[in-house]
Structure formats: C-alpha cells, structure tokens
C-alpha cells in the first residue's frame, strides 16, 4: 500500500524530512523505483481549456499572439472558463483579421475553445428566429482551429514556461501508482480441493483482505 497512491507526494515528504540518521533512505529508494516516468514537453498535449494550465499563461498568450489585454478566469467547480477584453483595451487587427473574422473575433473564439465548444455564427430571420450561417461558421471554425494549434505550440516555446508547466502536468497526472494486490502467497483454508483459483481471483481476495471491501465484477 505504501508504494501506491500519490507516490510523488510521499517522496517529496521523505526528501524534506530532517533525517540525519538516514532512516528514510530506504523509503526514498523504494518510492523512486515505482515513481511514474516524467513526461517531457514534447510528449504532452497542451490544449486551451486544460485545467492544469493557469489563466495567467493564457493571458500572456493573448498579449504576445493576439496583441490584446484579456482577462481569463477559470471556475473549476463549474468547469467553466471566461475570456473578455479588458476595459479600455484597444482592439488589434489580430483580433478581427489574423486570428478572428468579421463575425467572430479572436476573443470570442478563444472563449469557445477554452470551453471545448465549436463556435457557430447565426443570422436573424424576419420572424425573429436565428439560423446558422454556414459560410461564416466555417470561416470562424477555421480560425478557431488555427488559434488552438498556435497555443499548443506557443506553450512550449519559452524554456521557463515549458519546464514549469511540464512539472505541473507531471505532478497532477504522473504521480499515482495503482495498488498491486498479489494473492499468490495466500493458502485459502477451506477451499475445495477440486478448485484451483486463477491469479486474478487470488488478487481479488488479497484486495478484500487489504481494503476490507471490494466489488468483484469477474465473469462466471
């Protein structure tokens, strides 16, 4: 059990403990052996709306690429993002031309991408309904795809940012080791002599003994 769960947090704890006698060295060595491999930036896909990328990095992206001052806010409890141009900020050509269209500027497309939504352009009809404008929608979605692609490469272009975000990703997603319940050593008293349990069945018994509870979905 000790070598499962968030082993990175356990390893960090052992490394920071005042240990003049080296009592924690075996723990550190064991945890290092099972620690998941750190992924490199080239192995990580950075997409707009990924919860491990802070808002400030997206705001910096807007400053450098869109030439715009944008407030980006993430509400993790709702899984929602908002992006809006700051009051008094000028609207750059990049917003409505290079990274946006006349019907959907780059901030609108950024907001859609952050929320994993494809933007749709609609027109009002004489009776007050709204219908999709296929040509304008296609143009907007092409710009949205270009924007998301640019972001995925921009994230890793600056070394300090790449190191920081790769570290954050690994801390969140490359720190957990699933428990390995091995029941091959169990004697199972009372078991019928004509029945030989399989490896996964012995493992299930070991898990029950360890956790005190389990749901078995084995085929019969």
Language model: regions and residue ranges:
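Charged, low-complexity intrinsically disordered regions
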Residues: 1-175
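Conserved pre-motif I regulatory segment
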Residues: 163-219
């Amino acid at each position: 059990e000790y070598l499962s769960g968030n082993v990175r947090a356990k390893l960090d704890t052992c490394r920071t403990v005042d240990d003049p006698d080296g009592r924690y060295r075996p723990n550190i060595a064991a945890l290092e052996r099972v620690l998941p491999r750190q992924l490199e930036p080239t192995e990580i896909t950075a997409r707009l709306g990924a919860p491990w990328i802070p808002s400030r990095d997206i705001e910096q992206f807007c400053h450098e690429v869109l030439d715009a001052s944008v407030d980006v806010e993430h509400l993790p409890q709702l899984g929602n993002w908002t992006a809006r141009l700051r009051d008094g900020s000028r609207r750059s050509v990049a917003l409505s031309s290079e990274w946006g269209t006349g019907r959907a500027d780059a901030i609108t497309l950024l907001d859609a991408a952050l929320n994993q939504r494809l933007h749709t352009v609609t027109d009002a009809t004489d009776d007050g309904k709204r219908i999709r404008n296929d040509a304008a929608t296609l143009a907007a979605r092409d710009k949205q795809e270009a924007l998301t692609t640019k972001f995925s490469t921009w994230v890793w272009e600056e070394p300090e940012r790449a190191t920081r975000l790769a570290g954050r990703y690994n801390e969140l997603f490359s720190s957990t080791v699933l428990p390995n319940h091995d029941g091959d050593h169990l004697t199972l008293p009372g078991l019928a002599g004509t029945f030989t349990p399989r490896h996964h069945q012995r493992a299930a018994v070991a898990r029950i003994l360890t956790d005190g509870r389990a749901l078995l979905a084995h085929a019969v």
